[in-house]
Amino acid sequence: SHGVPIEINELALDADRLILTGGIIYHLLAGFGAGRKAVLPGISSYQTIQRNHCLCLRDEIGTGIKPEIVSGNLKTNLMHQDQMEHGAAADADFLVNVVANTHGQPAQFVCGHWEKAWLEGTKLVEKIYGVPINGLADCVIASSGGYPKDINLYQGVKTQDNAVKAVKPGGVVILVMELEDIHEPAEF
């Protein structure tokens, strides 16, 4: 319904059983990782992946990402909604996803129907990692939490995205990251 072609790997669709696996965590663009993301982008065509990611962008070129494309948002997130349509088209037989605790160890496995089990896992992510913001701050000091979350700017930008949501307009964000593997393009 979003104009993104449903092009899923035929090997997966022709298999006797399709079991989706992954780890559920906040996702910068899709709201949450895992679940339907095992289908799109997981086993979808390059064209489908690119078109799905374009749903994140504002209509006017150069104006960035739509404001509803944020971590934790599933209700108005077009990228997520499109991924759900692709997940339904794949008609997986089973899902096994894990939610890790703050030490990277399994807190809980969610298993069963690809959509229902995954949605239960997203609730646990909110419980473990969700932090209510009661007011915006003048200054936010944030850390990615160490390796591998701060290995490079590509990963570190996720911390920036969250920190900016907690600071007043015109406020200051101080990010603490090691950036051990910084090989991003200069413009990044």
Where do the PLM segments sit?
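Conserved, well-structured core segments that form the ligand-binding/active-site neighborhood
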Residues: V4-L136
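Structural motif
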Residues: I19-T21, D138-S143, I174
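Conserved AWS/pre-SET-to-SET junction and N-terminal core of the SET lysine methyltransferase domain
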Residues: T122-L124, I128, G135-K158
